Amino acid sequence: MVGMAVTMEHAGMTHLLADGIARLAGPAFPLAAPFIGALGAFMTGSNTNSNVIFGDLQQSVAALVGVSPLIILAGQTAGGAIGSAFAPAKIIVGCSTVEAEEGPALRAVMRYGLAMLAVLALTTGAAIYLFGR
């Protein structure tokens, strides 16, 4: 993961993606930051890997949009923690331990995870607009 993230940064891919996200999301970007963190953790099964892959991206978008990178990166990390909880790798391990089916377990956990992400997105947005310009 680190190799991929470093390659993306050195090749300019991270900045290109950040520019596109900043143009697309604009001032609403803080609401999306936790979802990006959750996506990274969902894909990799790890909050740390999510931060490695998307940390530079989030920081670049924050700079382009003109908001506090500290709050955005806090949203990234908190979103990654939530996303890690319903990562398929973790669901498979848990279900194999208790001999349950993965599909129903993933659907049940996703409902709660998406609700928590929505609250986190609103919290991140509020923190930016109240404290973090």
What residue ranges belong to the model's regions?
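Transmembrane helix-loop junctions in multi-pass membrane proteins
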Residues: 5-18, 43-46, 124-133
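Helix-coil boundary and interhelical linker segments in multi-pass alpha-helical membrane proteins
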Residues: 59, 63-70, 130-133
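Juxtamembrane and boundary regions of transmembrane helices in multi-pass small-molecule transporters
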Residues: 78-133
